[in-house]
């Protein structure tokens, strides 16, 4: 039995439990608060490479009001914690994608938007196309479509929020 468990078994804490208060370990509480805060304030950075970027801009417009979900687009990778890769990733652009990903602060998440970013799309058999951005950076959410609608990207962002709330494990990457 650890020190924290001994404190929680104390008669003083038992009185709080009897009155209906939730008594938990401090580390569990901190972890819950961090998950809630991370999921409620996603700051995506756009990495638009092709026509999917137009739909990404459409999602950021006032019709969908991403601010109510705590989602605010940032231009700098140092201020963002989510990168949305939208469009065809070429071999020449892959090192730049990795460099931008490395500049993001931890924890960082990646959303792959559209068929081209997911697996090469229409240009899959071209010699100069990377067959999925997951070969360069780890991807958390895949949004299918060519191009995916603004609603599909919004659903992907909400799925990322749920993923962060469900499990905080695996969100810190090197």
From Swiss-Prot:
Main enzyme class: translocase
Binding site residues for [4Fe-4S] cluster: 51-52, 116, 146
Keyword Transferase assigned: no
Assembly and oligomerization: NDH-1 is composed of 14 different subunits. Subunits NuoB, C, D, E, F, and G constitute the peripheral sector of the complex.
Similarity comment: family membership: Belongs to the complex I 20 kDa subunit family.
Organism listed in the record: Anaplasma phagocytophilum (strain HZ)
PROSITE patterns: COMPLEX1_20K
Positions in coiled-coil regions: none
Localization per record: Cell inner membrane
Single GO BP term: aerobic respiration
Membrane topology of the entry: Peripheral membrane protein
Protein name: NADH-quinone oxidoreductase subunit B
Lineage: Bacteria, Pseudomonadati, Pseudomonadota, Alphaproteobacteria, Rickettsiales
Gene: nuoB
GO CC list: plasma membrane; respiratory chain complex I
Cofactor, how bound (note): Binds 1 [4Fe-4S] cluster.
């Amino acid at each position: 039995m650890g020190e924290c468990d001994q404190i929680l078994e104390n008669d003083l804490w038992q009185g709080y439990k009897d009155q209906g208060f939730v008594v938990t370990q401090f580390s569990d509480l901190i972890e819950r608060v961090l998950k809630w805060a991370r999921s409620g304030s996603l700051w995506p950075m756009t990495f638009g490479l092709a026509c999917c970027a137009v739909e990404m801009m459409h999602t950021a417009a006032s019709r969908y009001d991403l601010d109510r979900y705590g989602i605010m687009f940032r231009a700098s990778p140092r201020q963002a914690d989510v990168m949305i890769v939208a469009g065809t990733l070429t071999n020449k652009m892959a090192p730049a994608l990795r460099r931008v990903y490395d500049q993001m602060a931890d924890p960082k998440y990646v959303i792959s938007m559209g068929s081209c970013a997911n697996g090469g799309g229409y240009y899959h058999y071209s010699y100069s196309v990377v067959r999925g951005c997951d070969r360069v950076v780890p991807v958390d959410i895949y949004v299918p479509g060519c191009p995916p609608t603004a609603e599909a990207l919004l659903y992907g962002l909400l799925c990322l929020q749920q993923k962060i709330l469900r499990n905080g494990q695996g969100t810190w990457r090197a």
